[in-house]
């Protein structure tokens, strides 16, 4: 059986990237909460 995690930078960015987060209200809330916490990395 193959491993379930088959990394792809493009898929990762498209699903969890900054532009995807900013496209919805919930995503913007995620980014803002991470900013408030002082996260170095906001999105994938």
Curated annotation (Swiss-Prot):
Residue ranges of region Disordered? 1-44
Which HAMAP family has this protein been placed in?
Answer: Ribosomal_bL34
Q: Where is the composition biased (Basic residues)?
A: 1-22, 31-44
Q: What name appears for this protein in its UniProt entry? A: Large ribosomal subunit protein bL34
Which family does this protein fall into? Answer: Belongs to the bacterial ribosomal protein bL34 family.
A GO molecular function annotation here is: structural constituent of ribosome
Alphabetical UniProt keywords? Ribonucleoprotein, Ribosomal protein
NCBIfam families associated with the record: rpmH_bact (TIGR01030)
Pfam families linked: Ribosomal_L34
Q: Give one GO biological process term.
A: translation
Could you tell me which PROSITE patterns the record lists for this protein? RIBOSOMAL_L34
């Amino acid at each position: 059986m193959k491993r379930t995690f088959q990394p792809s930078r493009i898929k990762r960015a498209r699903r969890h990237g900054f532009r995807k987060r900013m496209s919805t209200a919930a995503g913007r809330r995620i980014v803002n909460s991470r900013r408030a916490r002082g996260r170095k990395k906001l999105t994938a």
